[in-house]
């Protein structure tokens, strides 16, 4: 798509210029004719043309920039363009009977929030390009210094894979940091947590004090149930939050939910 549109810093726009990387990102999604695709922030259409070439059942482009939407509609009439902020998109309202896949070069300033919402609200395979540091955090496991609230949260709903690193030189304007492409595979519904609001609060609360021991973080909520939880899980209350797996956070919440502030 040819356009003189200047990237808007307020929207975190960095347009991908490398067709080989664009194709590699789309190939990572493994699109079939039965897939309904949502692309977040299509911008100048770097990924869009390769998505359409893959032949999905449908393609929806979620674009916040009203200056770009008309050009996208003209260039890709096969796609439906929705002028909307991905942070306000109704991810939970997607038809559960359709095979959804979501892809996008996410703006650095809102990428974590978008992924947080999508992981919990819809059952979709996703491929996202994000800031390299964020990609490391999302895909890190327990015990890693990169492991944090977003790692626990997204991995409570999805299996995550780090795919490949992307240099700043392939964007216009060039960002100051590296990017990376990651992939989410949704877990079976029966393996996902149920009380997601409570779990989210607990995870965020614990990682606010990530250098403290669990016993000190949870001192107001220590009960026989928590002590039994620690014994059952083989966890010491002298451990720090980064030692707990997503499943252990879920079982911890069940032990403290009656005392934890709603």
UniProtKB/Swiss-Prot annotation:
Membrane-crossing residue ranges in chain numbering: none
Subcellular location: Cytoplasm
Keywords assigned by UniProt, alphabetized: Cytoplasm, Methyltransferase, RNA-binding, rRNA processing, S-adenosyl-L-methionine, Transferase
EC numbers on record: 2.1.1.182
Residues holding S-adenosyl-L-methionine: 14, 16, 41, 63, 85, 105
Disulfide partners: none
Reactions the enzyme catalyzes: adenosine(1518)/adenosine(1519) in 16S rRNA + 4 S-adenosyl-L-methionine = N(6)-dimethyladenosine(1518)/N(6)-dimethyladenosine(1519) in 16S rRNA + 4 S-adenosyl-L-homocysteine + 4 H(+)
Cellular-component GO terms for this entry: cytosol
Keyword Coiled coil: no
Pfam families according to UniProt: RrnaAD
Top-level taxon: Bacteria
The UniProt record lists the keyword rRNA processing: yes
Chief localisation class: cytoplasm
GO-annotated molecular function: 16S rRNA (adenine(1518)-N(6)/adenine(1519)-N(6))-dimethyltransferase activity; RNA binding
PROSITE patterns in UniProt: RRNA_A_DIMETH, SAM_RNA_A_N6_MT
Protein purpose: Specifically dimethylates two adjacent adenosines (A1518 and A1519) in the loop of a conserved hairpin near the 3'-end of 16S rRNA in the 30S particle. May play a critical role in biogenesis of 30S subunits.
Family per similarity comment: Belongs to the class I-like SAM-binding methyltransferase superfamily. rRNA adenine N(6)-methyltransferase family. RsmA subfamily.
Name of the molecule in the record: Ribosomal RNA small subunit methyltransferase A
Organism, as annotated: Maridesulfovibrio salexigens (strain ATCC 14822 / DSM 2638 / NCIMB 8403 / VKM B-1763)
